[in-house]
Amino acid sequence: MKTIAAGSLSSAFIGCGDASMEKNKKISLGTKRNPIGVSTYSYWQFNGRETPIEYCIEKSAEYGFDGIELLLIQMESEENSYLQNIKKQAFHAGLDIMGLSTHQSFVSPDKSKRQENIDLTKHQIEVAYALGIPTIRINTGRWGTTMPTNGKSEFDVLMDNKGVEPVIDGYTENDGFKWVIDSIAQCIPTAEKCGVVLGLENHWGLGLTSQGVMRIVNEINSPWLKVTLDTGNFFDNREAQLEELAPHTCLIQAKTYFGGAKWPAFNEINIDYPKIGELMRKNNYRGYISLEFEGNENAETAVPKSLDLLRESFYFKLT
């Protein structure tokens, strides 16, 4: 069984394309590969939001992906004419626009701020609807108590702390969960009306653990709220946490770190994709895998290698 350490990815899959071609030949009748998409921010590499969505669509089609997941903050506009041109370009390129990755934060004692984020999320659902996208990634939000330190940004410090941050003084985690649950519940009617599944990601804040994610999903108990499963965002108890989320997953965001991870904490993580693939087969997952490349290697070489790796690992039985 392969185990993939982020820090060694730069060399672990030399010749991966050839190996994956051989494995493709061995896939038996009665099985099918999961469709593989790619997040547009895999091309951005945290160097700014200037990488155009149009370029990402062109490269994704060139590399042979089945779909593309759009990062909303990377889009230059939310005007309908821009959205429809993006949809048309993806269609002609042979790509599904299979996901929209959004940002919001419901973790605030300020009711007006929570309402602002509820309204924002409803708007994001409508953007997805205009693009024909079936699911959006949503977050709980964070406490916002992490501060820049020693020349490091707030997010760099958060990553050094593996996503853990203190609760706002005078409040409890239970307060935070109530805010998040009440806020997401108000977005469900819009999601149902537009036919867009909300995928709550294990992504810092109250979604740092599988238990936190499932507390929210179970409490709301709606078919329009599922899980966006990120393979790289669990630092501890990885297997148990992945297993807890797997049955509720509507989209997998699959991290790779060729060339080593930008944030050192992720170099400590071993992502065993064949094992994750087996877990998802046990749960009859037939949906999209969306590549999120977060390594230091140039995207032009790392993204195609990542596609080979994911093609090799994710498939399912037809019967």
Where are these regions (language model features)?
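Active-site acidic/histidine proton-transfer and metal-coordination neighborhood
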Residues: A5, S10-A12, K25-G30, Q89-H92, ...
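Conserved beta-strand positions in the central sheet of alpha/beta enzyme cores
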Residues: E69, G99-S101, R137, G199, ...
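Glycine-rich, proline-tolerant flexible connector loops at the mouths of alpha/beta enzymes
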Residues: E69-F91, W143-P148
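Residues that line or immediately flank small-molecule/substrate-binding pockets and catalytic motifs
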Residues: L72, Q104, T140, T256, ...
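A short gly/proline-enriched turn/hairpin at secondary-structure junctions
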Residues: L72-M75, E201-H203, E294
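Short strand->helix junction
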Residues: M75-E76, V107, F234, N296
